[in-house]
Amino acid sequence: MAEPTVCSFLTKVLCAHGGRMFLKDLRGHVELSEARLRDVLQRAGPERFLLQEVETQEGLGDAEAEAAAGAVGGGGTSAWRVVAVSSVRLCARYQRGECQACDQLHFCRRHMLGKCPNRDCWSTCTLSHDIHTPVNMQVLKSHGLFGLNENQLRILLLQNDPCLLPEVCLLYNKGEALYGYCNLKDKCNKFHVCKSFVKGECKLQTCKRSHQLIHAASLKLLQDQGLNIPSVVNFQIISTYKHMKLHKMLENTDNSSPSTEHSQGLEKQGVHAAGAAEAGPLASVPAQSAKKPCPVSCEK
């Protein structure tokens, strides 16, 4: 298979298995040596596949071990983890009936979350429930995504598109920590998280807004939104890596692109932060050329 086809197939396999897998497990689905597979993943880069070395816990099955994988440094056995990443997004303006064609997916956001009241009779919904329309197929093709079914695309979007997260509280994002200007505090029905972090744009290494997506206060909100916790964990892993990468780039005084050696360093540095982000919250809760681009974030 040509490399773009291989990458698309790898994304399909990853999303059929929850959006992330150990490298050794992914290897079982392709006729490539481990060295060749790693080369494909590294060439595609973290914009497509996030490849990180993590510490595993012995005595667990593959699925349990993958879910429990954390930062390297605890003295346990390490393995390489692969997370599916994509810049494909749902179009925000389409949700409001304001866009006919652009470089983002024209698909019902509520249906993607399994919450559209017309999901059993999609012809009564004014928004498309079909990922195979000409517009959507062109968008997927431009992102190098071929052959994904709706469930696989859903997994990919859930762990990459901030549009599908609960609505972020804007009052929380203003004023001082702990709650900003939000008087509802823990009773607020909006997401108390750094708005810039979920968009991959937070420039602060030490931010007074929360970068933790999963904690006791947010668990019910996430579940009510129709999100599964593994997908949110994947979003956390990807966002933590992006935050560290952005901060490192801002520190680079000559504004040059990070070197290969620097990027490899982020593979390990990023997983330390992501591992810590996973461990804390989870432990505290019950276990085209002429088309005009649209804004990235969804307005609800």
From Swiss-Prot:
Residues 252-300 are annotated as: Disordered. The modification N-acetylalanine is found at residue 2. GO terms for cellular component: cytosol. It comes from the Eukaryota. Keywords: Acetylation. It holds the Pfam family zf-CCCH_PARP12. Residues 252-263 have a biased composition (Polar residues). The keyword Heme does not apply. Residues 271-283 have a biased composition (Low complexity). This is Zinc finger CCCH-type antiviral protein 1-like. The lineage of its organism: Eukaryota, Metazoa, Chordata, Craniata, Vertebrata.
